[in-house]
Each structure stands twice: as structure tokens, then as C-alpha cells.
Amino acid sequence: MSLAEFDADVVINAQNCIVGRVASEVAQRALGGETVAIVNVEDAVITGSEEDVMSVYETRSELGSDQGPAYPSRPDGIFKRAVRGMLPYKSDRGREALSNVRTYVGNPYDDDGEAIDGTTLDRLSNIKFLSLGEVSANLGATVTW
């Protein structure tokens, strides 16, 4: 399905927002039947020290064999995988909800998107974080953003 065919009910800007908090809100909206587009996912952040965050993602990407499980290394794939983890994706209802979610590096829409209350980075006292773009670059993804 191309961008022209995906008419999103809601466009969410993930710039400087915490990945898990945005993903949980997106999962709830998708289960409610809305089509959701998330833009600027490369600028979404994961809290924690660089060593802790990278050890988790490096372990995930190294697990499995050539046949799987495969873990994404691009920021849009990592974000969509986080949303998938919050959905019952093995049921028809969850698969339908996941098909109503699109993630984008950059912003292909004319609309800047809305920021969800309570998900921005300025609510934290912890200053240790990594953006999804930095995580992807450290995992070896080709940087195109």
C-alpha cells in the first residue's frame, strides 16, 4: 500500500517523544479502529544510558539464525515492532490493528502531526537517552535520514 492509498485519520509526530509512551497510545488508537501514521520516528528517543540501550538492541539483533527471528535495524521498523509488541498481533483483531499503523522516517505528509500529551522528553529529569536514529546507526543500518 503506497502513501497515496494510506489515508491516515491521525498523523503523530514522534520527534523528541519517548518511544514506549507513543507506541502504547498508537496501539490503543489502532485497536479502536483508527488509521495512524507516525512521522519523524528517527527522532523518537529511548531513555537510559547508551550502554544499556545498545546492549538490549544488539542482543535482539544477534539472536536467532538466518531463518529468524529477524529484528529490524531501521528506525521505522524498530518503532513498528514496539507497537506490534503492544498488540495481540497473532489474532485477527491485532493483525487488523497493525495494518492500520504506518511509520515513516521523515514526514511525507503536508500535516506536521500532533504531539501526544505526556510523551515528550521534557517531562523527564533523566537526561540519558538515545534517539532511534542513533540506535539504528549503531546497529549498522544504512543511514538515509
Curated annotation (Swiss-Prot):
Species assigned in the record: Haloquadratum walsbyi (strain DSM 16790 / HBSQ001)
Family: Belongs to the universal ribosomal protein uL13 family.
GO cellular component: cytosolic large ribosomal subunit
Known function: This protein is one of the early assembly proteins of the 50S ribosomal subunit, although it is not seen to bind rRNA by itself. It is important during the early stages of 50S assembly.
GO biological process: negative regulation of translation; translation
A Pfam family assignment: Ribosomal_L13
One MF term in the entry's GO annotations: structural constituent of ribosome
CDD domains recorded: Ribosomal_L13
Leader peptide range in chain numbering: none
InterPro entries: Ribosomal_uL13 (IPR005822), Ribosomal_uL13_bac-type (IPR005823), Ribosomal_uL13_euk/arc (IPR005755), Ribosomal_uL13_sf (IPR036899)
SUBUNIT field: Part of the 50S ribosomal subunit.
Highest classification ranks of the organism: Archaea, Methanobacteriati, Methanobacteriota, Stenosarchaea group, Halobacteria
Keyword entries, A-Z: Ribonucleoprotein, Ribosomal protein
UniProt name for this protein: Large ribosomal subunit protein uL13
